[in-house]
Amino acid sequence: MRKILKQFLAFCIITLVPFHAFSKTYNLDIAYKSVNITGNFVKKIAINGTIPGPILRFVEGEEVEINVINNLDEDTSIHWHGILLPGEMDGVPGLNGFPGIKPGEAFTYRFKIRQTGTYWYHSHSKGQEQDGEFGALIIDFKDADPVKFDRDYVVLLSDFHEENASNILANLKMSSEYYQYARRTLTDFFYSVEKHGFRRAWENALMWGKMRMLPTDLADVTG
């Protein structure tokens, strides 16, 4: 009789434990992909086969689960930029005990959505973000949106370079002006003298000489 009572109590305890169901689950497959944007095929990193990755859409208050599978030959990660969440779910390797995701392994992010707005997610490992591992993240209001609109468009801007990010970083370490193809020449100085006079042209040249960027440098990486 006592044995039956114990089994009955155990059954009651098990059935009373709440089952935690997640409101939304996404699976993100990180893998290399050959892409042609400039007319040449180059190796980049895609999420679920696309660059940028898929738009992740949530609703305020949802409990979400995101499974990230690493099919690269190096560690990877996903950081949820601007999202309020537990530290261990932030996705920055080396912080809050998160080691990153090893090749061939997966990691499941679980957190509750506590805000609304337009955000983005991206790798926080090496230069993988620059190589294509990023995407948009939209969080809708739980109740009616305070702003009326006919249609919601998501615009995600990004630079693209045929070189991989590790090569770009190595080149910039050799010289911060490595990609500065339109550098000023002596001819430009004479043109400035003709237009503004020698004194102003000389002072202008000295001023730029003290700076870390050239006047023709519109971006860190060009071409």
Model regions: which residues?
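Bacterial N-terminal signal peptides that target proteins for export
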Residues: 1-9
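Cleavable N-terminal signal peptides
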Residues: 10-11, 21
